[in-house]
Each structure stands twice: as structure tokens, then as C-alpha cells.
């Protein structure tokens, strides 16, 4: 399994000035389906940690998948995928880093 740090930010302006409009209801329904999708991935062990930022409109999580193809499928099936800016960073381990440093030491 490979772990990736994923940071996602919505790339849309939300018309939330009037929360009782049908447009706001559609946006909230879309966001709810995205959070439900993330919760389902967490229950399956694909998301192993993370959650929404409390100070900005974004989420951060650690995705644990066996292949890059599965990661792509997860992103593609995300309800907010067309409106999401995503940063993905592969994660190593501290043990691997220490081993690499030992090999570099004289």
C-alpha cells in the first residue's frame, strides 16, 4: 500500500449569501454527498486520517491505496471532482528516511 497526503480545495464560488435559495440547497446537497463519500472511504480504510480544515474551505487526508490507478478512480468518483483543486504528495516513512541517511553517511 502507498500513502498519499491529499489537500483539496473547492474551485467554485458559492452563492451562500442567501442560504434559503434553491441554489444554496443544491450546493449543500453536493457538499454533503462529498463528505459522505469521504466517510465511506474512511470506513473502507482508504482514508486513514484527516478531515476538514477549520480555518479555510479545504480538506486534508491521508489516502492509503495499493495503486495510482485506484487513487485516480477515487478522485474521479468524487462528487466534487470537477470543481476541486487537488494537491497530492506521496508519503514515505521516518524509518526509510533514516535508512537512507545511514547509506549516505561516510
Q: Where do the PLM segments sit?
A:
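Conserved, structured core segments of small domains
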Residues: 1-106
Amino acid at each position: 500500500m502507498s500513502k498519499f497526503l491529499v489537500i483539496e480545495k473547492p474551485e467554485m464560488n458559492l452563492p451562500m449569501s442567501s442560504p434559503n435559495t434553491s441554489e444554496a440547497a443544491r450546493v449543500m446537497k453536493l457538499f454533503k454527498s462529498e463528505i459522505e463519500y469521504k466517510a465511506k472511504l474512511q470506513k473502507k480504510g482508504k482514508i486513514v486520517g484527516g478531515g476538514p480544515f477549520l480555518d479555510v474551505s479545504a480538506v486534508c487526508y491521508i489516502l492509503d491505496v495499493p495503486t495510482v490507478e485506484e487513487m485516480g478512480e477515487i478522485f474521479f468518483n468524487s462528487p466534487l471532482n470537477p470543481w476541486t483543486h487537488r494537491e497530492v504528495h506521496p508519503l514515505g516513512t521516518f524509518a526509510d528516511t533514516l535508512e537512507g541517511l545511514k547509506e549516505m553517511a561516510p
